[in-house]
C-alpha cells in the first residue's frame, strides 16, 4: 500500500470534502512504511518537521490555515533532500531512495499549491 496525498475543502457544515483527482494523476506520498521510516523518522523530526511526523501515528490533516507552514516544512525537506535520503531507512540504493523522496515531495508540493489556490487543506493517509 502507499500513502495518498489529497486536497480537501470544508463544507459549510464543517465536514471535509476530498476533491476528485483527475484520471492519471499520481498521488502517492510514499510507501505505507514511510510513516515511520521516512516522514516520521527521527532524522526528519530532528530537522524541525512537525506535520509529516504525525504520519507515524495517524493520518495527516493539514487545515487550510496551516498549509503555508506545511509548505515551508516541505521546502525545508527538499532543501535537505540528500541528508533526508541518507538519514532515513531505505530498502534500495541511496540514489533510488533520494529519487523516490524527491518524487513524493513534488506530489505533496503540487497538492499544497492546489490547496493554496482554492483555500483548502491537504490530507495524507
Feature locations, PLM:
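Acidic (Asp/Glu-rich) sequence patches and key acidic residues
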Residues: 1-125
Amino acid at each position: 500500500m502507499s500513502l495518498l496525498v489529497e486536497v480537501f475543502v470544508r463544507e459549510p457544515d464543517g465536514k471535509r470534502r476530498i476533491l476528485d483527482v483527475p484520471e492519471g494523476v499520481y498521488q502517492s506520498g510514499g510507501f505505507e512504511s514511510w510513516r515511520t521510516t521516512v516522514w516520521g523518522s527521527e532524522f526528519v523530526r530532528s530537522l524541525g518537521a512537525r506535520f509529516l511526523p504525525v504520519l507515524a501515528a495517524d493520518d495527516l490533516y493539514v487545515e487550510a490555515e496551516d498549509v503555508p507552514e506545511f509548505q515551508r516544512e516541505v521546502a525545508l525537506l527538499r532543501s535537505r533532500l540528500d541528508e533526508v535520503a541518507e538519514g532515513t531507512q531505505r530498502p534500495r540504493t541511496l540514489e533510488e531512495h533520494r529519487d523516490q523522496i524527491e518524487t513524493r515531495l513534488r506530489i505533496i508540493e503540487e497538492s499544497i499549491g492546489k490547496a493554496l489556490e482554492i483555500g483548502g487543506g491537504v490530507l495524507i493517509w
